[in-house]
Amino acid sequence: MPAKDDTSSDKEKSLELFLKIGLDERTAKNTVANNKVTTNLTSVINDAGVTDGCSRTVGNLLYTVATKYPANALPHRPTLLQYIVNSKVKTTAQLDAALSFLSATGSENLDLNKFEEACGVGVEVSTEDIKHAVDEVVEENKATILELRYRVNVGELLGHVRKRLPWADAKVVKQLVDAKLYEILGDRTAADNEKPKKKKEKPAKVEDKAAPVATSEKPLEEDLNPYLIFPNPEDNFKVHTEVPFSDGNILRCCNTKALLEKHLKATGGKVLTRFPPEPNGYLHIGHAKAMFVDFGLAKDRNGGCYLRFDDTNPEAEKKEYIDHIEEIVQWMGWEPFKITYTSNYFQELYEFAVELIRRGHAYVDHQTADEIKEYREKKLNSPWRDRPISESLKLFEDMRRGFIEEGKATLRMKQDMQSDNYNMYDLIAYRIKFTPHPHAGDKWCIYPSYDYAHCIVDSIENVTHSLCTLEFETRRASYYWLLHALGIYQPYVWEYSRLNVSNTVMSKRKLNRLVTEKWVDGWDDPRLMTLAGLRRRGMTPTAINAFVRGMGITRSDGTLISVERLEYHVREELNKTAPRAMVVLHPLKVVITNLEAKSAIEVDAKKWPDAQADDASAFYKIPFSNVVYIERSDFRMQDSKDYYGLAPGKSVILRYAFPIKCTEVILADDNETILEIRAEYDPSKKTKPKGVLHWVSQPSPGVDPLKVEVRLFERLFLSENPAELDNWLGDLNPHSKVEISNAYGVSLLKDAKLGDRFQFERLGYFAVDQDSTPEKLVFNRTVTLKDSYGKGGK
């Protein structure tokens, strides 16, 4: 019998460990299949000290910690685990509250009193307390309960009880609510078990009014001002952060009265923010949130937002990316206060570095990258850390003048190598690179790091609010340490959660692979979540900004937002702005035998569902001729009760035109392939069939309708979170793009221009693509309709 490989053995050990903590077998096996969650859960179990097992209740809470713990608060995870194993945090509600509190706290010092208060530690809720709350909630909702009986939304009732008693045992709450309902209503009747009847709709109703999917209800944040949480510039005198040092000292960073007064005099008290992309790739939907935060706050407070290119790496910058970023920022509806480059400040940054050395806060180091990594892991000082200031000044000048080889020296900040925060491990301020800079030319051969430059430039530009995503929170200490060391103005820093959208990847490295390895058709491929891709797909900046606003500016990290929420906002926008038209993707010829070839009837089709009869601009003309085309999928040889398309001997309505009845089917020699349908129309319109089909027709005898190409897009990845997969490229959806080259459209479309958007009835919303030519238009499907006609043979 062959020996098991190490991987198989490790998985068996992990499975055994997970079963010990009470996970059910299915959950345990699914966890083992996910390397990231396996690593996290194993670490949590070890840190909690329960490798020999624990109760199922504790195990389930540990599993939640492993999958949902906020990355910005890792220093506090051991504390939470002890609260769990000691049964101080013992319910899901308590754990959710604890995770929320820790996410807001981040890497700052944890106030245990506030933590315990926030998650209900020590709060005991008796059964009598729960019974009293249930009685109150049921009484308040009694009229609804009596009307709907057992069809009442029990979840809402439970929610009302939870608001009164957030730490109550959920099982007990459910049992008491069920008992109270039985007390009032008695046994269920047959009527209670019937599904509520829905109002019957016409089968071919066009999507007149888009509604959100069940998972995408319009959140309250959209109706609030998301910028109310930010302080005014004149209030920027409080302690920004505390930086604990390994020797026991604590640095409390804040602006002096003189620094704040100087800043306010320079700005006139205006809010100034900055949007600082690195020009090394195309912006994606995550940047849309950053723009909404940075530009949005400035606009809300009548201030200004810099568009600042963080171009400290001369090898990564491309003019293509700079041009794209400027253009896409404008397309998103934002107007920069000024466009600046970090390289504009290279001279000032250099002078600040010299001053930092003079103050004893920086030194020239000769360690290699590997040595720096090793010393950081061991928390050891560099051998050159305590060299004389004069020596570092001379060597830094030699670095500037090009006298030292690339890789032989760096300038490092003298922070705290024994700190608990790895972002205080003597970060590099300057590196040598003998590479001309695209913006600054060949003046410099030393370039500042992001950690050194961005906070100083924030101060130079008098930025009032420096806003960034949560992964930068641990850098807050080094940010303020540097500004304090130089004695210059300190902006207010605040971190918010990244925007993570399902069924896509957004890391620049992964996006670059998709593009360079030709998995997609460039940075603006409509399947990508780049802003260029979303624009090409037909999405509007209004819809994208509404989506971002709906997410709110929160600190809850790690949440994966369903792409359906974005699609909801897109439908809401396009439903109001996209005129209707008809396109047949897979045409099936229908010959109207009781209409002469040259006797086409002109009919009015609506551009808008609420078009008024006296408004000619709300309609377009289409000919109803003796040759029309319907979707091939709207015809069947065998009719059925629940089918609303066309079949032999059956009638349907051609939208805006007449009822037609199939009288004959012409088959090919194989007796299977349908070549054409023959039908008669009812000029009196007395026939009232249920099915309504979209269609196009020959504009004149023997002349085909307008031929167009249509591209249908689906999710680029099959999994909700492909970024978590080891073989993420293997998760690509092979059917994410379907090209239909010979679709037919109504003549209304012939003058459509790049970017024009339409609702193709029963098919979805579409936009004109840049690949269109005078000979042939190309349309991209932006989103499907909320519902298709359903009964139209689709």
From Swiss-Prot:
Motif 'HIGH' region location, chain numbering: 277-287
EC annotation from Swiss-Prot or TrEMBL: 6.1.1.18
PANTHER family hit by this protein: GLUTAMINE--TRNA LIGASE, GLUTAMINE-TRNA LIGASE
Reactions that this protein is recorded to catalyse: tRNA(Gln) + L-glutamine + ATP = L-glutaminyl-tRNA(Gln) + AMP + diphosphate
Presence of the UniProt keyword ATP-binding in the record: yes
InterPro entries: aa-tRNA-synth_I_CS, Gln-tRNA-synth, Gln-tRNA-synth_Ib_RNA-bd_2, Gln-tRNA-synth_Ib_RNA-bd_N, Gln-tRNA-synth_Ib_RNA-bd_N_1, Gln-tRNA-synth_Ib_RNA-bd_N_2, Gln/Glu-tRNA_Ligase, Glu/Gln-tRNA-synth
Residues that coordinate or bind ATP: 278-280, 284-290, 469, 498-499, 506-508
Family annotation (CDD domains): GlnRS_core (cd00807)
Protein known as: Glutamine--tRNA ligase
Residues binding L-glutamine: 310, 450
Pfam families per the UniProt record, alphabetical: tRNA-synt_1c, tRNA-synt_1c_C, tRNA-synt_1c_C2, tRNA_synt_1c_R1, tRNA_synt_1c_R2
Any GO BP: glutaminyl-tRNA aminoacylation
SUPFAM superfamilies: Nucleotidylyl transferase (SSF52374), Ribosomal protein L25-like (SSF50715)
Protein family membership: Belongs to the class-I aminoacyl-tRNA synthetase family.
Top-level EC class as recorded in UniProt: ligase
GO molecular function: ATP binding; glutamine-tRNA ligase activity
Chain span(s) of sequence motif 'KMSKS' region: 505-509
Sequence segments annotated as region (Disordered): 192-217
